A protein has these predicted regions:
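Short, solvent-exposed loop/turn segments at secondary-structure junctions
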Residues: 82-87, 217-219, 245-247, 301-305, ...
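Active-site PLP attachment segment
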Residues: 85, 347-414
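Short, flexible/disordered intra-domain loops and linkers
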Residues: 47-50, 87-95, 174-178, 269-279, ...
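Structural motif of enzymes handling amino- and sulfur-group chemistry
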Residues: 395-464, 472
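Conserved glycine-rich beta-strand-loop-beta hairpin in the small C-terminal domain of fold type I
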Residues: 438-447, 454-473, 480-509, 538
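Conserved core of the PLP fold type I
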Residues: 116-325, 337-351, 355, 553
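PLP-dependent enzyme catalytic core of the Aspartate aminotransferase-like
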Residues: 3, 10, 21, 26-28, ...
Length: 585
């Protein structure tokens, strides 16, 4: 690289040449000239786009990338969404094999040639499953189902017929979910999974109750709704939000129905040499000592920075709750927990104050399954706060839930969420669909069994993510500091940090003055058919971009990195061109 860092050069046949490779197309100085001549200064359109959600902006970027594809005949690379490009195969194979067994059980009950059959019968069904699997003993799915059966019997002494009957009915989907909150054996398996993956094998004493939901998004909706319905949060109350964060956590509190006063606690700590650590300042966190703060919302590991909360921050939060704000309600979204070795959720450290959301979507490649859980300790502050409500509020809630049970005062908050999820009146048909629950069960047991047998699934998953992350940053020419708290599912790249490191403060000020932060994401879409999201939309650094490391191939991140660097260098070249005098080499 030249000392001024404007372009990356190499010598070819005696000529100095700038070169960028993207999408299997190698371009030279002509591409640089195209960037230099494209004066996309701040305009009203970009300012307007800064006000919308990054996920809605993504649709506009895709349109621009599509136009670029038609014009330049290349492939769009969409790194704007966290939908992974992998699937966990064995638990799915087991699901389909279990479906074959369940259909045999239906036909065993009764069958007619018109395409009708009965339903699975409980008596002796576990022995029949054993024979079914024995006949297919060479199939990996059969071996896995046998391990699942043995695990539940050996670890939890469940009744074999009762459990296998639940499994068969689940995969067939012939009944309403009973219990509505989560099925018995599904809850047992997922409780063990959460203890292993979210609590690092050190769960809190007592029972963690689960509510199976239609993905993490449904869990969010149910939590916000029930907190308000049960007067735990009133319109206009003060809450805290740890940022950057998944955009809906920013947008939902602003809705007229909630209109919460939101204080953001930014992950603003920097290293001595000006690099983001993506951790929280103790002074900012100290604001939570004020009991005016009713609730704290966090995604941990974070989205988009993709870092777990540091141990000293967790310790400080524990101290704040124990000494200053014991009624603080915490909602933690831990969907990326499995990407940080040794991760411990706030649910493990502050179990009585915490609602945990966990989705199976990201780890198992299952966004389309819409499978998640809300986890709460049975002894929790939410139930206690309901007990302390004024008599008038309790009377209102008795009227709300009175059609479900006569002793509403003994109805736990988690069960109120179940009822609220179906407008109370439809509580009798509440619950996640049975096929979703059995696939969730198989996902959970797969991770548990795999860990006992060498943890190969997790290790390979981490290897894939880390290779993509390294490729992205190496191709940009930026430095990625080692950090054991990094999940790596996303990468948030603050372009101003690198602009200053490469070109200095004067260039940064010029960039801010002449361009909108969205200019980068628009140019990537328009000029290179790349879709990334603006980090400012997550209340992160204004000039940052979010790249998902989950949904493209390793070679694609090399293309993305080089394209990002090319645009940064093009800004610098234009800045130098604007200076009264530029020194030559």
């Amino acid at each position: 690289m030249r000392k001024d860092g404007v372009v990356k050069v190499k010598t070819e046949n005696g000529k100095r040449k700038a070169e960028y490779t993207y999408n299997s197309i190698t371009t030279n100085n002509n591409y640089m000239k195209q960037l230099l001549n494209d004066h996309s200064e701040v305009n009203s359109f970009e300012r307007e786009m800064e006000r919308i959600s990054p996920f809605e902006l993504k649709n506009r970027l895709i349109e621009m990338a599509d136009e670029s594809i038609r014009r330049m005949m290349r492939t769009m690379l969409n790194a704007g969404r966290g939908n992974p490009n992998w699937v966990a195969t064995l638990p799915r194979e087991a699901f389909f094999m279990l479906g074959q067994f369940a259909l045999m059980e239906c036909r065993r009950d009764w069958e007619c040639p018109e395409g009708l059959a009965g339903i699975p019968q409980k008596e002796g069904i576990s022995a029949r499953l054993g024979e079914f699997l024995k006949e297919r003993h060479s199939d990996a799915a059969a071996q896995f189902l046998e391990k699942c059966f043995r695990y539940m019997i050996d670890e939890h002494s469940v009744d074999g017929d009762t459990m296998v009957h639940e499994w068969a009915e689940c995969v067939i989907g012939d009944q309403y979910p009973v219990p509505d909150r989560i099925l018995k054996h599904c809850e047992i398996a997922v409780q063990d999974y959460i203890a292993q993956e979210l609590c690092d094998g050190r769960p809190p004493q007592g029972t963690i109750d689960l509510f199976a939901t239609e993905g993490g998004t449904a869990a969010m909706c149910y939590i916000f709704d029930s907190l308000q319905q049960n007067r735990l949060l009133e319109r206009g109350d003060t809450i805290a939000l740890m940022t950057p964060v998944f955009t809906p956590y920013i947008e939902i509190p602003k809705l007229y129905r909630y209109n919460y006063r939101v204080t953001e606690i930014p992950a603003g700590r920097m290293s001595e040499d000006g690099m983001h650590l993506w951790q929280y300042d103790s002074k900012e966190l100290g604001k939570l000592r004020d009991p005016e703060y009713k609730a704290l919302f966090i995604v941990n590991p974070s989205n988009p920075p993709s870092y777990a909360m540091a141990e000293e921050t967790v310790d400080l939060l524990v101290d704040i709750v124990n000494k200053w704000n014991p009624n603080l309600m915490i909602v933690t979204d831990d969907v990326y927990a499995t990407y940080v070795p040794g991760f411990q959720s706030l649910m493990a450290r502050l179990p009585h104050n915490t609602i945990c959301v966990y989705s199976f979507s990201k780890y198992f490649g299952a966004t389309g399954w819409r499978s998640a859980v809300i986890a709460m300790h049975r002894d929790n502050i939410f139930d206690k706060l309901i007990e302390r409500l004024p008599r008038k509020r309790k009377t209102e809630l008795k009227q709300r839930y009175g059609s479900i049970r006569s002793d509403v005062e003994n109805m736990r908050f988690i069960d109120r969420m179940v009822a609220d999820s179906r407008q109370v009146a439809l509580n009798h048909t509440a619950g996640l669909s049975l096929p979703q629950q059995i696939q969730m069960t198989l996902f959970a047991l797969y991770s548990i069994i795999d860990k006992r047998e060498g943890d190969s699934f997790r290790l390979k998953m981490h290897e894939i993510i880390q290779e993509r992350l390294k490729t992205l940053w190496t191709s940009m020419g930026f430095t990625l500091l080692p950090d054991p708290l990094r999940a790596g599912y996303y990468s948030e790249i603050d372009l101003l940090v690198w602009a200053q490191r490469f070109y200095g403060k004067d260039f940064v000020e010029w960039l801010r003055l002449n361009y909108s932060p969205l200019d980068v994401v628009f140019r990537l879409a328009r000029e290179t058919s790349l879709v990334v999201l603006n980090g400012g939309g997550f209340d992160g650094p204004e000039w940052s971009i979010r790249v998902s490391l989950a949904n493209l191939k390793k070679k694609d991140y090399d293309i993305i990195g080089k394209s990002v660097r090319a645009i940064l260098d093009s800004y610098a070249a234009r800045w130098k061109k604007s200076l009264p005098m530029v020194e030559s080499d």
